[in-house]
């Protein structure tokens, strides 16, 4: 039994300093596939919108937008409407990256680089609002509170926000993958113990691997994936709102 990371599918050799060669990985390919599918789905939902006699498709689109608006307003207030597209994009991309494994593709959220990229975006926004609200000098002075020797701990506290967000999401998704894999191999061993004494091809029957792993996979990919997307977006709204204060 092996648990491997994303494979490198192709390498583009470059002479760019520091950047080095560009590696096309399973994570990158799957992420672009998810983005293409989400873009196509959004375009399909937004076609031929009407003010009256709306279709079920338009009603579904309006429901999604209304729920997203309410989610952001409840967590951040009405002064942060400009972040509704960002929160919606992160939520949709997180769910899409989790569910893509259902059709046999590599899940980008099983790669820490994916969550780290999202967390860095959130961290930049947090730093922007802290500096905008307090001023850069006041922000730097705050890192020295209550005494200057606390500066390293305060800096570590700032950096821990994106790190904890990334590892929380990644860890939960990875744990689901590990549990599903262990269950699959445990059921294979159980099938071998029960049917291994039968003659011929009957001894190769993997009865217990049929159905049960699929249900556990659906739980971790669908339910667990949606929960993690919700938690990540909730933390995003809370941290940005806290950094912005009462803007």
Describe these PLM feature segments.
Residues 1-247:
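Selective transmembrane helix interface/packing segments
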């Amino acid at each position: 039994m092996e648990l491997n990371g994303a494979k490198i599918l192709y390498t583009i050799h470059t002479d760019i300093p520091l950047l080095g060669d560009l590696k096309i990985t399973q994570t990158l390919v799957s992420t672009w596939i998810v983005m293409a599918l989400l873009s196509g789905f959004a375009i399909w939902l937004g076609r031929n919108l009407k003010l009256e006699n709306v279709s079920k498709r338009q009603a579904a689109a309006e429901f999604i937008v209304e729920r997203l608006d309410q989610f952001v307003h409840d967590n951040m207030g009405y002064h942060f409407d400009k972040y509704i597209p960002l929160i919606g994009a992160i939520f949709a991309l997180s769910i899409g990256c989790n569910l893509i494994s259902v059709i046999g593709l590599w899940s980008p959220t099983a790669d820490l680089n994916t969550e780290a990229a999202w967390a860095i975006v959130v961290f930049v926004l947090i730093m922007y609002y802290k500096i905008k609200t307090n001023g850069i000098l006041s922000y730097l002075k705050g890192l020295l509170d209550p005494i200057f020797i606390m500066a390293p701990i305060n800096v570590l506290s700032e950096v821990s926000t994106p790190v904890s967000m990334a590892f929380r999401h990644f860890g939960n998704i990875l744990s689901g993958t590990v549990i599903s894999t262990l269950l699959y191999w445990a059921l294979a061993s159980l099938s071998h113990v029960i049917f291994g004494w039968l003659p011929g091809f009957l001894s190769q029957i993997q009865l217990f691997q049929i159905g049960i792993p699929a249900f556990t996979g659906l739980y971790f990919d669908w339910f667990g994936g949606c929960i993690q997307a919700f938690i990540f977006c909730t933390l995003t709204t809370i941290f940005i709102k806290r950094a912005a204060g009462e803007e």
